[in-house]
């Protein structure tokens, strides 16, 4: 056992949690204690004396509603709010055994891509609830949570990485995070923000990684302050862009995201292409699938812009822009302490809800 998840930690006695932390440290040096906390100042529970991490419900809410409402200001504001609590290793998630599946919550299923790009790149420890990597749906019912906790036959998903764009994206993001230390240890700096586009940097040891997301049905151009290098490469698409006058000019595809890293400065990095990176190919394969089979959640494409066009028209607020390219000294990256090392972990919640694997 490498860790324990404490249910309803916000009602546990603090003296008990302190004693548990001391005991856990004696049993195993890197034993991990995570608590379920719905709201409040997370630093009350996450510190050197009590727990290592708690559930980040604040970001959970912002990730899906910020996309449903085309409001990246909500996500950016939430990140700043959490940063003000201190350098916490929060457990980031988009769904779990108590809430509806992310694929069900999203009004536009194509937003599965930018949501998960943010999950894997914003400060914190990313987690995936079993089954959601396949894009399965689950709606919370009045008297039962059975639909949120189905039994899955893994044989049904044996080739999911090759055929399911949701799974391909999750697999790629996991590899990218593993080979990009700045996503685990780097400081956070907001670079550009509108209702529908969002860009930020993760800086570590002179290396700047840039993350761009777009929740609009049209591609968007962005000009962003880059790091001290000659060229950047998109880790999902493999696309290369030059640094010109200290900036990169990139185009972010509709309803997508990209993680840009300095080319040639990260020898461990191996470019990864996913089905979601090739929008036309995904749409063609989806049409072939739906023409021969009844559409299921795991078969739906995450890049089908047609769904949005057919959806109910919504009122679009005036576009607001904030230039936040300056990096504050307050956002200096943490040292590689034991606490910072927790950020490198990616947690997968198994069918057994009380254990981390």
Tell where the protein language model's regions lie, with residue ranges.
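Conserved small/polar residues in nucleotide/adenosyl-binding loops
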Residues: 353-355
